[in-house]
Amino acid sequence: MTRDKEVWKAMTKFDYEILMLLNEKNVDNPLKAINISQILEEISVAKRKSYSTTYRHLQSMSKQGYVKCGLVDGLASTYYIDELGKAYCKAQN
């Protein structure tokens, strides 16, 4: 549990927005995974970042175990929330 809290402290507000979106939309397996453009469409304009910044955040969260890559959608990578990401969201509520 200590390790999780340390990782959670490194979470940014934008990471949190992405995780909460994936959790609320129940994007929790490779078949339901959504691409970066779809993620950005769902995030409010005031909180939205660029495509490349979003990609970097998703890559970081993937390395930490919060999200995983889903099935490829055309040429686009897709992402879904993993168990650690769900646990983080649950701990925030």
Regions found by a protein language model. Name each.
Residues 1-30:
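Short alpha-helical segments that sit at the start of domains
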Residues 14, 32-35, 54-57, 77, ...:
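Short, conserved alpha-helical segments within structured domains
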Residues 29-43:
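Short acidic, hydrophobic short linear motifs in intrinsically disordered regions
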Residues 72-93:
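Short, cationic-aromatic polyanion-contact patches
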